[in-house]
């Protein structure tokens, strides 16, 4: 009897002491609205939880600020877009060709190199390894709307303007001087977007 009591007590302690894994998301969070495409910026590595990535357009207006295990949603009309993703001392240029009714995922994270952690942007392309791991990448992330970030959304980047311009020019230089494989790595085309049927299969 005493043994059974200890087992029951231990099981109860385990259940109370280990927090349940929060639901990563509701699938509906990622459905594109009528006539628009949805872009989801994922920053969800524990090691990066204190880091913030800033995403802005070529007019230097902020469209997203992602940090702390977050999946931030941005809705856009169809058409080509150039975005710049800034993290630490690095800025990366990416190009998107979103299609209405589809959802595109971009993972923001760091990779470890000899000189330390380096920011990286990984575009989730259809049928890629990242596509297959998408559920894992989203697990535990808080879904937010970029338009709710009043400090960022649609505001010009005024702080450290000269430094921002320099990094933007460097990112454009990397794009221009890179080969086709480099540009392909940082480009999402229409077919890379997930349909409503794809998202239903998450």
Model-identified regions with their sequence ranges:
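Positively charged n-region of N-terminal signal peptides that target proteins for export
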Residues: 1-5
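Bacterial N-terminal signal peptides
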Residues: 8-17
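Short loop/turn and low-complexity linker motifs enriched in small/turn-promoting residues
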Residues: 22-80, 84-202
């Amino acid at each position: 009897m005493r043994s059974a009591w200890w087992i029951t007590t231990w099981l109860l302690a385990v259940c109370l002491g280990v927090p349940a894994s929060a639901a990563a998301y509701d699938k509906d969070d990622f459905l594109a609205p009528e006539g628009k495409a949805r872009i989801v910026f994922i920053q969800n590595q524990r090691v990066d939880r204190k880091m913030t990535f800033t995403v802005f357009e070529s007019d230097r207006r902020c469209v997203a600020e992602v940090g702390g295990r977050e999946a931030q949603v941005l809705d856009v009309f169809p058409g080509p877009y150039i975005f710049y993703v800034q993290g630490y001392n690095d800025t990366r240029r990416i190009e998107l060709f979103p299609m209405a009714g589809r959802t595109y995922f971009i993972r923001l994270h760091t990779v470890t190199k000899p000189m330390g952690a380096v920011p990286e942007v990984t575009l989730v392309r259809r049928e890629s390894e990242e596509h297959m791991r998408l559920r894992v990448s989203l697990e535990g992330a808080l879904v937010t709307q970029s338009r709710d970030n009043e400090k960022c959304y649609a505001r010009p980047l005024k702080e450290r303007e000269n430094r921002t311009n320099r990094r933007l020019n460097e990112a454009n230089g990397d794009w221009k001087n890179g080969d086709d494989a480099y540009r392909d790595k940082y480009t999402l085309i229409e077919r890379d977007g997930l349909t409503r049927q794809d998202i239903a299969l998450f």
